Design a protein with these regions (language model features):
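Short N-terminal targeting/anchoring amphipathic segment
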Residues: 35, 47-67, 82-84
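N-terminal strand-loop element at the rim of the active site
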Residues: 1-41, 48, 132, 215
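Aromatic "clamp/platform" in nucleotide-sugar-dependent glycosyltransferases that forms part
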Residues: 263
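Conserved donor-binding/catalytic core segment of Leloir-type glycosyltransferases
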Residues: 163-181, 187-190, 207
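A short helix/loop element that forms part of the nucleotide-sugar donor recognition site in Leloir-type
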Residues: 145-164
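Carbohydrate-associated surface elements
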Residues: 114, 138
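Short hydrophobic beta-strand element within catalytic cores of glycosyltransferases
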Residues: 280-283, 293-294, 300-303
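Nucleotide-activated donor-binding/catalytic signature segment of Leloir-type glycosyltransferases, i.e.
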Residues: 76, 218-246
Length: 336
């Protein structure tokens, strides 16, 4: 695997994770090597790896624009091994400008049902020459799982956020502070919710925001909170310290619900984490978040996007899993 970073400190030093991988998944014969590199690699490095490691295929992950250098030599590579691409696309309209990228691959694996449909829409007649599959995002159920309410370590963790013991309802936001996550909308929704409650009820509610308070890719969240809650009665807790996976599992188990109102979302990992811990969620109906709501069509089957109904954001179907509270958009906008 090419282990890329902007300026990787270990460039040139191969890291062998085979033993750790064997232990993690209880096998004996894995071969997992990391080749640290700057950026996303280059033609010279890929040619060297094909010659040295003799892989059966190349698997790409992330936005195609980071691999333009690879797509420029796809004819050279595909005479030796296939190029496969585990890909995601946030939302409609279908990115027709990606057609040449998709066509440079032998197999496309869509992380969401919408992505698989978008791959097919963009390729058109060329789709018959490709392998296109839906491979939903997954997480390790040994890392995120439901805990009993009387779990000692969980209750010890709860005391960090509920030190006076009077909180009866906690809503969790866990994601990056970036524009498309619509965090100010989440804070405004929290205000509208609190406005429906009495003073005594408000004091029993809490919004935990596990994110960076200020980010150049997002906004100044403390400023938003001060603007919407000049009386400082918001009951919002900012959690910006890095937590271990075990602590994150505690956080999801502590919450009564999770909220994610992204305007565009390829998948929405915080929803998957909430599902594994048995925590219901509120989410915008867009992208891969729809998969996790499990909408049902008129035939009683799990909704699968088509060119005619490429997304359920227009409220074509309303029946979904009992764990989800869908938020259907009231308006559409082009961003870009």
């Amino acid at each position: 695997q090419l282990a890329g970073a902007i300026k990787h400190p270990d460039t040139g030093r191969i890291q062998d994770l085979s033993e750790a991988t064997n232990k993690e998944i209880d096998i004996t014969d894995s071969s997992v090597l990391l080749y640290p590199c700057d950026g996303y690699g280059d033609e010279k490095l890929v040619r060297m790896l094909i010659e040295k490691e003799k892989p059966d295929a190349i698997l790409l992950i992330t936005d195609p624009r980071y691999f333009e250098w690879l797509f420029n030599i796809e004819d050279e590579i595909r005479t030796q091994i296939p190029i496969t691409y585990l890909n995601i696309w946030d939302d409609l309209p279908a990115p027709m400008y990606n057609q040449e990228f998709y066509d440079s691959c032998d197999a496309l694996f869509g992380i969401s049902k919408q992505t698989k449909n978008i791959n097919e829409m963009v390729l058109g007649d060329k789709v018959k020459n490709k392998v296109i599959k839906y491979i939903p995002h997954g997480l390790n159920h040994k890392k995120f799982f439901q805990l009993e309410n009387n779990d000692k370590e969980l209750n010890k963790f709860k005391s960090q956020f509920n030190n006076n013991g009077n909180k009866e309802f906690t809503l969790l936001f866990n994601s990056r502070n970036i524009r498309r996550k619509s965090i100010p909308d989440t804070i405004l929704a929290w205000k509208y919710f609190l406005d429906t409650l009495s003073k005594e009820e408000r004091e029993k509610c809490q919004l935990v925001m596990h994110t960076q308070p200020i980010d150049q890719n997002g906004t100044d969240l403390p400023a938003v909170i001060r603007f919407l809650f000049p009386e400082d009665d918001h009951n919002i807790v900012m959690s910006h310290q890095k937590l271990t996976i075990e602590q994150m599992n505690f956080l999801y188990n502590y919450a009564d619900g999770v909220i994610l109102l992204s305007s565009a979302e390829g998948w929405g990992l915080s929803l998957t984490e909430s599902l594994l811990t048995g925590t219901p969620f509120i989410a915008n109906v867009t992208g891969g978040m729809q998969d996790q709501m499990r909408f049902v069509d008129e035939k009683g089957k799990w909704f699968t996007p088509t060119p005619d109904v490429p997304s359920n954001h227009k409220k074509t179907y309303t029946e979904c899993g009992e764990w989800a509270l869908p938020v259907f958009p009231t308006n559409l906008s082009l961003v870009g």
